[in-house]
Amino acid sequence: MLYVHPRSNDNKDFSMADPTETAALSVNAPARLHLGFLDLNGELGRTYGSIGLAIDRPSTRVTVHRAARDSARGPESKRALNVIARLRERLGLPGAYDITIERAIPAHAGLGSGTQLALAVATAAMRLGGIARPLDLVGTLTNRGQRSAIGIAAFDHGGFIVDGGKGQSDAPPPVLIQTPLPESWRILLILDPKATGVHGDRETRAFAALPPMERTTAAHLSHLVLMQAAPALMEHDISGFGRAITEIQALVGRHFAPAQNGSAWSEPRVGTLARKLEAGGAVGIGQSSWGPTGFAFVPSQKEADALYHSFVQDAKAQGLELTIAAGRNTGASVEIRTVAETGQ
């Protein structure tokens, strides 16, 4: 049985499976790209405002069973157990759980690994435990969505997403736009397997040390998103979309450069390869979140394949990996295995 959970903003329950009939759940959660912020000025009482999208690879897949005691195996297993402990403390999650992380989005690569793992584990454990909560609340309880709602919205429904930034509420930012990506578009991802982006306490300090963004810059970023990037995407105009994303990335990258050794790229080699892809015909180049993952958009699989074959050896020579992804227009998927199926 394949079950894709409902959108949280439809005010439906987060937990739908009958726990008495369910032996295990497997959750597959998509990575996301964070394409930039709208407002790091904050004069209007809201800060951040994020742009992003769900992609079909890499992804995190976890399988959770009821157990006599908590246990976890696979990458990021300690973080998975921390999610269970937090849900037990804050929601009274009953029982114990055995967690297998079959694959995981690379950690601290700018692809939203922490949010997807937390929501995947929480989805499975809460359904097995018979607890129903809206997805936004689950994000808050697991300390996700503190600045951006892109990861939660990507898990929820996929697509291209714009959120309205953080106000005074503790809840994740409201989602303003969530629309499908054109099915034919492809994204070339530039990965650096040996590097990590700014994260944890260092990330908190970096945000605190950044000066307020100029109001005119924040206004221009909002203008680019509302009047160019979003409508161009909806009209399948990849050139217009790409121009907007490249400019957004340049403006946001300039603002974050003091936290990245004076560069818009956390790994300059990634930026160099992204510019080569752009010269080869790709559009909308940039860095996802704090990186090091870079990206570039093309209109079709054929053009993605051509650029991949032209630059994959260049990437390898620089210690980088080049891969092709597509947008994902659905959220996480949940496979329910019943007691009858497993014999438990």
Each predicted region: which residue ranges?
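ATP-binding N-lobe of GHMP and related small-molecule kinases
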Residues: 2-109, 126-133, 146, 329-332, ...
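Short beta-strand segments
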Residues: 28, 54, 153-156, 189-193, ...
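Short beta-strand-to-loop capping motifs
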Residues: 64-66, 74, 192, 296-300
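Phosphate-handling active-site elements
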Residues: 93-96, 125-141, 167-173, 302-311
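DPxDG-like acidic metal-binding loop motif
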Residues: 111-135, 154-166
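Alpha/beta catalytic cores of group-transfer enzymes, especially the acyltransferase/condensing modules
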Residues: 135-185, 271, 285-287, 291, ...
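Active-site rim beta-loop-alpha module in soluble metabolic enzymes
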Residues: 192, 197-265
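Glycine-rich, charge-dense phosphate/pyrophosphate-binding loop(s)
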Residues: 233-344
